[in-house]
Amino acid sequence: MKTLIARHKAGEHIGICSVCSAHPLVIEAALAFDRNSTRKVLIEATSNQVNQFGGYTGMTPADFREFVFAIADKVGFARERIILGGDHLGPNCWQQENADAAMEKSVELVKAYVRAGFSKIHLDASMSCADDSIPLAPETVAERAAVLCLAAESVATDCQREQLNYVIGTEVPVPGGEASAIQSVHITQVEDAANTLRTHQKAFIARGLAEALTRVIAIVVQPGVEFDHSNIIHYQAQEAQALAQWIEKTKMVYEAHSTDYQTQTAYRELVRDHFAILKVGPALTFALREAIFALAQIEQELIAPENRSRCLAVIEEVMLDEPQYWKKYYRTGFNDSLLGIRYSLSDRIRYYWPHSRIKNSVETMMVNLEGVDIPLGMISQYLPKQFERIQSGELSAIPHQLIMDKIYDVLRAYRYGCAE
């Protein structure tokens, strides 16, 4: 990361896409996409997804590292080209507890990530806990971030410390996506970004972390990009020029969250304006979902009824029976809920792919389709971009390859934005 940031600060047009997903097919696609390049791939886990207690994936940071490395070995991607990051590391998971208890767990969270070899650490203590004021004072946020940084430094080996980088600050949306419809978004003001940096510098120095300050490579701000279930707020470069000019006076770049669904031109403009770390998550699993839905429609027409996976029906049954991951995000009317479950840009379905019933139905569908020849006309109908690549010899009509290429479509846009 340090080399990439240095190149960007030296005037090169270069950025990096941060892949925020724990889905094995998404991680496989991210690694396979850059297998034949010289680029490093940044893969991040969030604190609610992966933590010392397992998170919602059931994985600790060390488990997640081995999970990613196993996929890399399968793909033939060198482990040393992977950068592992931890996103929103702080009291995010424990906001219902008092601050002392939540911070105690947050300290252990950060230590677990660093011990596991994660080198990009987002120190985010911006969330109010049960006995806190709302919102937290910037000084309190910075002091808690310094406590987390001290925890990271205390367990890092000399070798790890050379690679260790920190990201500070937070964006407006909650981690995981907006819960309500959005019409506009508040762009971070320069004075707020400057205050974030100033308060963190003061808090770090007060705890003897002056050297660690040199490892702060980025600050999270809101550049004016966001999405909800059915709306996308697109980057307006002219609105972010004050931010772009301010960061040029520092040694840092910006990290932009929720950049999913922007245009490839917007990604290029974001990187030009020093939002050099672009985080993406739901757009990748949304592409995966589109591919699986397309293949399910193809299966419906090619496979005898008694052998079909019933993939789409199983997904809906499970999500309606177990609504905990979507009910506070989508409208409650039955038809609206079904539309949200299937097609929401927030892609809450991503939390359900590991469910045994859904996983088994997808596997059955894949086996069914691997045993037949999919007519080109059907691929043109349901996966038109992949049809074009089959025609040009870039792709084969194999279900797994079709899914990979659908995810590559998202990564292609980020490559256009980030490439030197």
UniProtKB/Swiss-Prot annotation:
The keyword Ubl conjugation does not apply. One of its GO terms (biological process) is phosphoenolpyruvate-dependent sugar phosphotransferase system. Keywords: Galactitol metabolism. Pathway: Carbohydrate metabolism; D-tagatose 6-phosphate degradation; D-glyceraldehyde 3-phosphate and glycerone phosphate from D-tagatose 6-phosphate: step 2/2. Coiled coil: none annotated. Pfam families: GatZ_KbaZ-like. The keyword tRNA-binding does not apply. One of its GO terms (cellular component) is plasma membrane. Gene3D superfamilies: Aldolase class I, putative tagatose 6-phosphate kinase domain like. HAMAP family: Tagatose_aldol_GatZ (MF_01296). Component of the tagatose-1,6-bisphosphate aldolase GatYZ that is required for full activity and stability of the Y subunit. Could have a chaperone-like function for the proper and stable folding of GatY. When expressed alone, GatZ does not show any aldolase activity. Is involved in the catabolism of galactitol. PANTHER family: D-TAGATOSE-1,6-BISPHOSPHATE ALDOLASE SUBUNIT GATZ, N-ACETYLGALACTOSAMINE PERMEASE II COMPONENT-RELATED. Belongs to the GatZ/KbaZ family. GatZ subfamily. NCBIfam families: agaZ_gatZ, PRK15052.1. Forms a complex with GatY. This is D-tagatose-1,6-bisphosphate aldolase subunit GatZ. The lineage of its organism: Bacteria, Pseudomonadati, Pseudomonadota, Gammaproteobacteria, Enterobacterales. The gene is gatZ.
